[in-house]
Curated annotation (Swiss-Prot):
<keyword id="KW-0594">Phospholipid biosynthesis</keyword>
<dbReference type="GO" id="GO:0046168">
    <property type="term" value="P:glycerol-3-phosphate catabolic process"/>
</dbReference>
<comment type="function">
    <text>Catalyzes the reduction of the glycolytic intermediate dihydroxyacetone phosphate (DHAP) to sn-glycerol 3-phosphate (G3P), the key precursor for phospholipid synthesis.</text>
</comment>
<feature type="binding site">
    <location>
        <position position="252"/>
    </location>
    <ligand>
        <name>NADPH</name>
    </ligand>
</feature>
<feature type="active site" description="Proton acceptor">
    <location>
        <position position="188"/>
    </location>
</feature>
<keyword id="KW-1208">Phospholipid metabolism</keyword>
<dbReference type="GO" id="GO:0005829">
    <property type="term" value="C:cytosol"/>
</dbReference>
<feature type="binding site">
    <location>
        <position position="11"/>
    </location>
    <ligand>
        <name>NADPH</name>
    </ligand>
</feature>
<feature type="binding site">
    <location>
        <position position="241"/>
    </location>
    <ligand>
        <name>sn-glycerol 3-phosphate</name>
    </ligand>
</feature>
<dbReference type="GO" id="GO:0051287">
    <property type="term" value="F:NAD binding"/>
</dbReference>
<feature type="binding site">
    <location>
        <position position="101"/>
    </location>
    <ligand>
        <name>sn-glycerol 3-phosphate</name>
    </ligand>
</feature>
<feature type="binding site">
    <location>
        <position position="101"/>
    </location>
    <ligand>
        <name>NADPH</name>
    </ligand>
</feature>
<feature type="binding site">
    <location>
        <position position="253"/>
    </location>
    <ligand>
        <name>sn-glycerol 3-phosphate</name>
    </ligand>
</feature>
<dbReference type="InterPro" id="IPR008927">
    <property type="entry name" value="6-PGluconate_DH-like_C_sf"/>
</dbReference>
<feature type="binding site">
    <location>
        <position position="132"/>
    </location>
    <ligand>
        <name>sn-glycerol 3-phosphate</name>
    </ligand>
</feature>
<keyword id="KW-0521">NADP</keyword>
<feature type="binding site">
    <location>
        <position position="251"/>
    </location>
    <ligand>
        <name>sn-glycerol 3-phosphate</name>
    </ligand>
</feature>
Length: 331
């Protein structure tokens, strides 16, 4: 099968190798010419591992003509604009598979909703996402990984499941909870960012565990708002992805949070990062969502005040600890 990947960074190039291992033909579209040259010379652009039989081009039209399966692997901030370009180029319907984890700041749309708005319905054969605890640096080394393929059309989720499944190192589960999976995958970026901030202050494991538990509850509230399945929060794309992101030194969001806690300016963190840090924009998105839709997300709200309005950690913790005492109720 031929598969086109839009975005050849850390994750896009890694998935290209996985799909090539699965005997698919891959063409990556990447705007960074240096990345394109490295990929075409058989080298992963970020990790410098060997890539076999993976090709890349700067031409978006060439990539779209290559196959009917389009894998979206882009930062959320450029997703809408890129989809508009795609919609102008394609002349026949495509299958869209999203592997990007994020939410738009302005209108808190997940990637599925952005695709619906920017790609005319006649150009969409079907849509799925593939998410889960999956640091690219492990997958490129073919370390064991578990993911979830989700679609509103369960039969298509199962089709995508088989495309990505590799019996040697990557197992894929299927789901029809598309909204829940994409929300969890975006929200965990926020919790990982906050986890990094907390670690920089060395509050200890007790508080870290409490924060994660209550953070999952807030994740569930957002999933419920989007009419997703709250049980998804405790699966691979919720708790699973949170574990690998919130406590891992290789996590961009966790590292960004640590730097914020140590006093580094956000603009400098973004400037010095070669890869997208989705947690920063996702925090803004979920904060705005909580205000407009009146969703009670105390951790998100206080984290926003600390990170963007420079409130002291002492004030933030006092605000959280002085909330009215109540029954622990999960759902």
């Amino acid at each position: 099968m031929k598969i086109s990947i839009i975005g050849g960074g850390a994750w896009g190039s890694t998935l290209a190798q996985l799909l090539t291992d699965n005997n698919h033909q891959i063409l990556i579209n990447e705007i960074n010419l240096e990345y394109v040259n490295k990929i075409n010379n058989g080298i992963h652009p970020i990790f410098n591992q060997i890539l076999k039989d993976v090709k890349a081009t700067v031409s978006l039209s060439e990539t779209l003509e290559f196959s009917d399966f389009i894998v979206l692997c882009l930062p959320t901030r450029v997703m809408r604009l890129t989809l508009r370009k795609i919609n102008k180029i394609i002349s026949q319907p495509k299958y869209f598979i999203n592997v990007s984890k994020g939410m738009e700041i302005e209108n808190y749309k997940i990637i599925y909703q952005i695709v619906q708005e920017e790609i005319t319905i006649q150009n969409i054969k079907n849509y799925a996402c593939v998410m889960g605890p999956s640091h690219a640096e492990d997958v490129i080394l073919r370390k064991l990984t578990l993911l979830v393929a989700a679609s509103l059309d369960f039969s298509f989720a199962c089709k995508v499941q088989k495309i990505f499944y590799n019996y040697n190192y990557l197992r894929v589960y299927s789901s029809n909870d598309l909204y829940g999976v994409e929300i969890c995958s975006a929200f965990k970026n926020v919790l990982a960012l906050i986890s990094g901030v907390l670690d920089s202050f060395d509050f200890g494991y007790n508080f870290q565990a409490g924060f994660i538990s209550r953070g999952l509850l807030e994740m569930a509230k957002v999933v419920d708002f989007f009419k997703g399945d709250k049980q998804t929060v405790f699966g691979l794309t919720g708790l699973g992805d949170l574990i690998v992101t919130a406590f891992n030194e290789n996590s961009r969001n966790y590292q960004a949070g640590k730097k914020i806690g140590l006093g580094m300016e956000i603009k400098d963190i973004i400037k010095n990062s070669s890869q997208s840090i989705e947690g920063i924009n996702n925090l803004k998105a979920f904060y705005n969502l909580s205000l407009e839709k009146k969703i009670d997300l105390p951790i998100v709200k206080e984290a926003y005040q600390m990170i963007f309005n420079y409130k002291s950690i002492k004030i933030i913790l006092n605000n959280l600890l002085k909330r009215p005492l109540k029954l622990e109720k999960i759902f």
